[in-house]
Amino acid sequence: MQITRDKWSKNFSEWFDWVLREGEFYDYGRYPVKGMGVWMPYGFKLRQNIISIIRNLLDSTGHEEVLFPLLIPEDLLRRESTHIKGFEEEVFWVTKGGSEDLDVKLALRPTSEVAITTMENLWLKSYKQLPKKYYQIVSVFRYETKATRPMIRLREITTFKEAHTVHETYDDAQRQVEEAIEIYKKIFNNLAIPYVLSERPEWDRFAGALHTYAFDTIMPDGKVMQIGTVHHLGQNFSRALDFKIQKKDGSLDYPHQTSYGISDRAIASVIAIHGDDHGPILPPSVAPIKVVVVPIPAKNEEGTQQVMKYSIEICEMLNKNNITCVTDQDTEKTPGEKFYIWEIKGVPIRLEIGPRELASSTVFIKRRDNLKSYTVKKEEVVNKVKEVLNEIQEDLRKRAWESLKSRIEYANDIEKAKNILENNSGIVDVPWCGSKECGLKIEELTNARVLGYPIEDRKVNDKCVICKMNAKTVLRVAKTY
């Protein structure tokens, strides 16, 4: 087997659909509601492993998990006018209960800022209770009118982690924004997912936010996908819902809030970014199965049974050392057929055990990511597998970051930027004066989407590509999902 990435990069959409189906991650397009898929057992385990990383990082930083109702009354959703304008065309409405029309329409939760603020208004009365950090992992619903895509553009987003925090001051809320960004960096580092971090421009902020910071990654086809956002909401939602707290000086005022979310797209990026033409290569940190043992049959039944017994023994050794392992005991498939199956599931390590390994009390180790192989003694297999898993995790991370950085270019001319995006995709940084008019014109002329600008100071000794005034920073532009 050779490492090739033609199908993965040039026909990514087909590759992704094939992997989800054949790898038994996610069944999409066959459930009879557009934009809604079914998590299959193997994919659900991957999802749970990723959620576990998210939960651990949130729990360890003082976040408390809650669970809110799915339904939000229309009059409540409309309390924050900017917010509802941003979501109105995407809301699913429940208008009947049985055969009776409802007095008030109920929205299927598109996001929960208004719902959670409503209850915080009842629970939180004093600065002494702040800061307060809640989160939930739930389904949200968006009536997507564009072409839907499995895990990437859905009408039911089944893995929506939304955190909501409350603070006495603007500055403390900004400190929380910075903490959220650091949490997300740790999450994506655990997933070996590279990203660019930008502040969204004013015309592309989350509806109702003062500032929106976004994590974007580049998919194999060169398109960019948003994988996480952090919002400084200021007092917009607390003011709209008349939510006040007593401050240290005894006065009453509206608290400041933040919210931040990650969705199924993070899982999609894990499956997609580390792949090749044979399927995904799951990072060991989240792989449902870290090691698969494939027994190689002997020339006779007795020898084959001994090989199977030895294979099971090796797998049990690994499981006892918290390395998730399975032995493929299917006697009707050839080793080659088994290799194909486990490659498309993205299992990081394959152990091949046949008569030769049985006779020498050794194990043959094959890496999924770079095809390197090792033969080790039985007593060394646990330590060697741990070592190789760590190497795979780090190598996947390095390769992904190198790939992302290689696909970010600079262009001080709008035609050059357009050509790069049409031919290579990825991200193009263009010098920008900071005005909305020029930003929207950049989007129009490149036929692409503005991602935002770097949150760190980015000095540019160039002219804005539109108005030719001195540039204040760069604006990131990309073809997006």
UniProtKB/Swiss-Prot annotation:
Consists of three domains: the N-terminal catalytic domain, the anticodon-binding domain and the C-terminal extension. Its EC number is 6.1.1.15. Keywords: Aminoacyl-tRNA synthetase, ATP-binding, Cytoplasm, Ligase, Nucleotide-binding, Protein biosynthesis. Belongs to the class-II aminoacyl-tRNA synthetase family. ProS type 3 subfamily. PANTHER family: BIFUNCTIONAL GLUTAMATE_PROLINE--TRNA LIGASE, PROLYL-TRNA SYNTHETASE. The keyword Transport does not apply. One of its GO terms (biological process) is prolyl-tRNA aminoacylation. One of its GO terms (cellular component) is aminoacyl-tRNA synthetase multienzyme complex. Gene3D superfamilies: Anticodon-binding domain, Bira Bifunctional Protein, Domain 2, C-terminal domain of ProRS. It holds the Pfam family tRNA-synt_2b. The lineage of its organism: Archaea, Thermoproteota, Thermoprotei, Sulfolobales, Sulfolobaceae. It is an enzyme of class 6 (ligase). It catalyses: tRNA(Pro) + L-proline + ATP = L-prolyl-tRNA(Pro) + AMP + diphosphate. It comes from Saccharolobus islandicus (strain L.S.2.15 / Lassen #1) (Sulfolobus islandicus). This is Proline--tRNA ligase. SUPFAM superfamilies: C-terminal domain of ProRS, Class II aaRS ABD-related, Class II aaRS and biotin synthetases. GO terms for molecular function: ATP binding; proline-tRNA ligase activity. NCBIfam families: proS_fam_I (TIGR00408). Its main location: cytoplasm. Catalyzes the attachment of proline to tRNA(Pro) in a two-step reaction: proline is first activated by ATP to form Pro-AMP and then transferred to the acceptor end of tRNA(Pro). Homodimer.
